[in-house]
C-alpha cells in the first residue's frame, strides 16, 4: 500500500510538471464575472455573466495596457439564462486566437452593473 501511494505521488508530480502553460482565467467582481480561454498571449474565447436578468443588458470587452484603455468589442446583447432558481445574463465572444501584449489586462463591462473584472494576459 505504501509503495502504491509513493508511485501515485511521483506520477502526479510528473504529470503536473509537464502540463502546458495556458491562459485560462475566471474572475468575478461583485455581480459580474469574466471567463477567458487561450494559451500564452493568444485568446480564443472570452465571455462574461452578470447576476440577475434585466432588459437591455449589454456587455463589451476592453484592454488596459500601461494605463491606456482600448475597446476590443462593441456592445453585445446578453442572453438571459435561468438554471433552477439562479438567473443570470450571459455573453460570449469568439476571439479566434487574437494576440494581446504581455502584461495587458482583458476586462469586461456590463451596462447594468458596476463590477468590471479583469484577467491579466501574460506568457
Regions flagged by a language model, labelled:
Residues 12, 20-22, 56, 75, ...:
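Short, intrinsically disordered, low-complexity terminal segments
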Amino acid at each position: 500500500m505504501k509503495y502504491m501511494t509513493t508511485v501515485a505521488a511521483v506520477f502526479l508530480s510528473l504529470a503536473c510538471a509537464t502540463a502546458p502553460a495556458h491562459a485560462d482565467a475566471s474572475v468575478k467582481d461583485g455581480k459580474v464575472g469574466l471567463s477567458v480561454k487561450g494559451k500564452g498571449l493568444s485568446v480564443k474565447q472570452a465571455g462574461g455573466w452578470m447576476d440577475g436578468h434585466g432588459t437591455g443588458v449589454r456587455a463589451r470587452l476592453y484592454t488596459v495596457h500601461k494605463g491606456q484603455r482600448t475597446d476590443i468589442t462593441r456592445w453585445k446583447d446578453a442572453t438571459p439564462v435561468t438554471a433552477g432558481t439562479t438567473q443570470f445574463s450571459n455573453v460570449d465572444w469568439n476571439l479566434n486566437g487574437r494576440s494581446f501584449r504581455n502584461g495587458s489586462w482583458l476586462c469586461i463591462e456590463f451596462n447594468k452593473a458596476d463590477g468590471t473584472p479583469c484577467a491579466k494576459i501574460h506568457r
